């Protein structure tokens, strides 16, 4: 994980209860940068507006789905597509799962990069940041990354420091 980006993405990870709306809880800088990595290539490669609109809808639906608290057994599909169980491990406070499950759509990407973590039936026990002083409230969280060292808002994962 990138320490500069983490200071903004920490807003998304500050939630202690992951639910369907959590996919929309983001810092504005995080939105700008991450969306740019998707949208600019679509534009440069000349995809039509219709393709872009379909992509945006798919990404929005996937974000909602990945953050829901449904414990549906996805069977073999959980190895093909990001599921709530897979993504909840990305939000876990468990030190062994930090820097895991970065994929947005396809878990095989994490398999390739060695960041895949999906216990058979287990779900994380706790989510959120270790830093209890991380601010609550939308405006405070939008301002916080500009005036605080990212080390102060990281999970306990030493690789981010």
Task: Give the residues covered by each predicted segment.
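Membrane-embedded alpha-helical segments that form the functional core of polytopic membrane enzymes
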Residues: 1, 53, 77
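Juxtamembrane helix-loop transition segments at the membrane interface in multi-pass membrane proteins
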Residues: 1-11
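Cytosolic/stromal cytosol-facing helical appendages immediately following the last transmembrane segment
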Residues: 5, 14-25, 46, 62-161
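Membrane-interface loop-to-helix entry segments
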Residues: 23-40, 49
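Hydrophobic alpha-helical transmembrane segments
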Residues: 32, 52-54, 105
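Alpha-helical transmembrane segments of multipass membrane proteins
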Residues: 35-44, 60-64
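Transmembrane helix interruption/hinge and helix-loop junction motifs
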Residues: 44-52
